[in-house]
Amino acid sequence: MYKTKDILLTGFALFAMLFGAGNLIFPPMLGYETSSSWLLTMLAFIITGVGFPFLGILSVSIAGNGIKDFANRVSPTFSKIFAIISILAIGPMLAIPRTGATAYEITFLYNGMESPIYKYIYLICYFGIVILFSLRANKVIDRVGKILTPILLILLFLIIVKGIFFTNLAVKPDIYPHAFKRGFLEGYQTMDTIASIAYAGIILAAIKSGRTLTQKQEFSFLVKSGLVAIVSLALIYGGFAFVGAKMHSVLDTQDKIELLVKTTSYLLGGYGNLVLAICVAGACLTTAIGLVATVGEFFSSITSFKYEKIVIFTVIISFLLSILGVESIINISIPILVFIYPVIISLISLNLFGKYIKNNYVYKGVVLFTGIIGLIESLDSLGLNNYYTDSVLEILPFSDYGLTWLFPGIIGYILFSLMFRKAKMIENKL
């Protein structure tokens, strides 16, 4: 059996895995931009930034597969391609470079020390540390993370408490159009739904370690510990969004990191900014090391390349992309995430109820239809839209909520279920 203490410890471990310091830049700006609509915006953000990652872990628990096999019921070939794209997204193409860029910008850029020389020196040192600890099994970085994360959480708590209860700032009464859609799509940027599938095995192994539990008990343990993580994340994200909404009357900026830094400075003074820079940089560093190790282990398991070579290549690519800066990396990620997230969310939903779905063609239909809509929305985000694609997106139900793909996914499910209802559960290659 397990105790309440075990649930809390596992819950906070899951919280630490899903809580990326780099994700702190999103809630304040969402609150700042949406003003009195901040609560609806954050509800949507929490659904995609917190809820779906939790469901991702549950779906892996139910399906019994890791990320390499997560989409096997579509086809083994598709599953492998899906896994590669997902690992690249949370690895050298998006997430890892963003950790370096975030750490640099919070430390230097918005503290009056902007310089190309500082940037290159900082990022070289940053990724030098990443590659050093990724190549060598060492518990030092874990210990650093265990020290910095609590300090960061205390600092965040102080910012939230002071911003909410000890300031006389009021939220602007403006109503933001499409507030839910804004938050829902911004939640994609956390990339935690993708990461949750990759990390699910670690959490599941931790639950089973040293315990004799039935499958039902394991699932109950996971749900309860997951709720601890979800509530913790929701409180932090929601608190920062509310503080951001109140900052509109005293701060003028359109930059996410600048808003976070100036908010901290306004509420806690210069020393608060210094502590924020140290803690966020350290947290980003530990996140980057974990992601680089994940990329190295994944590609060394499916290719003939050695772990060390993959790590070096991953860090080099991440360094080069980090030079672009946080906003540029976010802009690059938008069309990619808009395309792959509908497919990922669909697969999570299907795997959650997989034992009730006897026909693998249903998986193919849902992925096909949601993938097409995701591709259209991706092209639209790049400005490659036309009259016909715009017309398709406009007539689809739930498009105002960022759920343009939902109705096509349901159609794909029904259509392929009827077309192949006599098909047995088989695994075909594309």
Stretches with model-predicted labels:
Residues I348-I414, M425-L430:
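C-terminal membrane-solvent junction of multi-pass transporters and transport-like membrane proteins
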Residues I67-S75, L235-L285, V292, S301, ...:
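TM-loop-TM module centered on a large, flexible mid-protein loop between adjacent transmembrane helices
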Residues I62-F70, Y126-L148, S209-T212, F319-N331, ...:
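Membrane-water interface regions at transmembrane-helix termini and the short interhelical loops
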Residues M29, S79-M113, C284-S300:
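Hydrophobic transmembrane alpha-helices that form the core helical bundles
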Residues P92-I96, L153-Y176, T193-I194, A241-A245, ...:
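Hydrophobic alpha-helical segments and their helix-loop junctions in multi-pass secondary transporters
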